[in-house]
Amino acid sequence: ARGKPDIRTQVMVQRSLDTRLPLIYLNLVGGQDDQVFDGASFILNQGGKLAVKLPQFEEATELVEFQEQDGKWSALPGTKYVCKTEMSQDYRAMSEGLKDYVIKSGFSKVVLGLSGGIDSALVATIAVDSLGAENVMCVRLPSKISSKHSLDDAQNLIDNLQCKFETISIENCQEAVINSLSSLFMGLHTDVTEENIQSRIRGLLLMALSNKFGSMLLTTGNKSE
């Protein structure tokens, strides 16, 4: 959660002050189901003074020496990692969460639909950063109303990411579904129903690719959807 590192530090500083002792805070790093742990383990000396802080969202090991003076122990200064911006933290959390979820679920590859919009572009970028371009397949699924601008944007992203891609037209599938429903829809105005058929077809084709090639299917919707 945003602001969690600052809250964590404040609580631990207060604990160090209360006990008048050095404090070692160890934190898991990586994703576990829907939880993402940011690492960033740290050591505070008596009085809450920071001695060591390890990186966020990275596995790290550091040898720390303690010294005694006048009967009081303190850690010698070491790495002091500076947390990145909140937006950078958000991106790293999504990247680490995706990577660990895919791997711990027994997959090594992913597949996703690429529309040319910002949602799927961000998911594709996170996937490539997390798993490597060779393990990501992006699929364009155009219909007869797909704009050239959207298709070009999708192609530009694929060129930049250097990941595998395929293009599968959904026009034939869409026509088959509409024809199957034509007698029931006769006399009714075209509305969101026909639009939603497109997304259902895309989902069906992407799931087929996922099943056939053993790739995890990534969704690309945002909270508004």
Which residues does each predicted region cover?
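CN hydrolase (nitrilase-like) catalytic-core segments centered on the catalytic cysteine
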Residues: 1-58
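Active-site adenylate/phosphate-handling loop in enzymes that bind or generate adenylated species
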Residues: 161, 184-225
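ATP-dependent adenylation/pyrophosphate-handling site
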Residues: 108-114, 118-155
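Catalytic P-loop NTP-binding/switch module of NTPases
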Residues: 44, 51-54, 59-93
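Phosphate/ATP-binding catalytic cores across multiple sugar-kinase/actin-like superfamilies
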Residues: 89-111, 205-209
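Hydrophobic/aromatic beta-strand patches that form the interior of the parallel beta-sheet core
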Residues: 22-26, 42, 137-139, 166-168, ...
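Conserved helix-loop functional segments at active or binding sites
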Residues: 99-108, 129, 133-136, 179, ...
